[in-house]
């Protein structure tokens, strides 16, 4: 097994700004609604505070790599180098730290894979810049939201009937582990 890098010590839960959660769900929906349902992939940006808290502030779609219903593949070094270059450009533009990647798992034949696949684990282990990996699960379901399980973020979109579940994984000394995630409320009430 490859050594796991980088190991960044931080305190759970990983905090998500509401805006970033909306971006993640919107990007997952975009892939879900394409012909043949495709996974989406992108980068996460934010901050690591002085008290070792990770705050996700932005999620940015990355169109590189070969996307399919069950994965995103970066086959060659040229593609990988373009992704690294794009991460650096966005880090500079947003003036935030690159924290990791996200991708979606879409419903196929009424089922959605709700874990970190072996390919996901290998990709995460070999990405020496990312210290978290976030998965957005999306499926069409009943007209009521699912309950949140410990440490996950759950969303429901009444207009479309889509359900979302967001899980975060981190590189730890004892391997890749799921860590708790939580939304930071903005305190703003929107009245329609």
Task: Please give the residue ranges for each predicted region.
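MPN/JAMM (Mov34/JAB) isopeptidase/deubiquitinase module and associated MPN-bearing subunits/adaptors
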Residues: 1-100, 104-192
């Amino acid at each position: 097994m490859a050594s796991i890098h980088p190991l960044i010590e931080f305190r759970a839960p990983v905090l998500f700004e509401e805006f970033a959660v909306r971006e993640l769900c919107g990007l997952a929906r975009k892939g879900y609604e394409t012909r043949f349902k495709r996974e989406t992939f992108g980068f996460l940006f934010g901050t690591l505070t002085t008290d070792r808290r990770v705050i996700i502030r932005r999620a940015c779609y990355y169109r590189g790599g070969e996307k399919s219903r069950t994965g995103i593949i970066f086959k060659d070094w040229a593609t990988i180098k373009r992704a690294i270059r794009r991460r650096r450009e966005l880090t500079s533009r947003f003036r935030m730290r690159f924290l990791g990647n996200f991708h979606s798992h879409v419903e196929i034949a009424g089922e959605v894979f709700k874990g970190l696949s072996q390919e996901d684990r290998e990709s995460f282990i070999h990405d020496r810049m990312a210290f978290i990996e976030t998965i957005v699960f999306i499926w069409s379901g009943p007209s009521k939201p699912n309950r949140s399980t410990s440490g996950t973020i759950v969303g429901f979109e009444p207009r479309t009937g889509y359900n979302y579940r967001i899980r975060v994984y981190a590189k730890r000394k004892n391997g890749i582990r799921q860590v708790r995630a939580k939304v930071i409320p903005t305190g703003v009430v929107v009245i329609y």
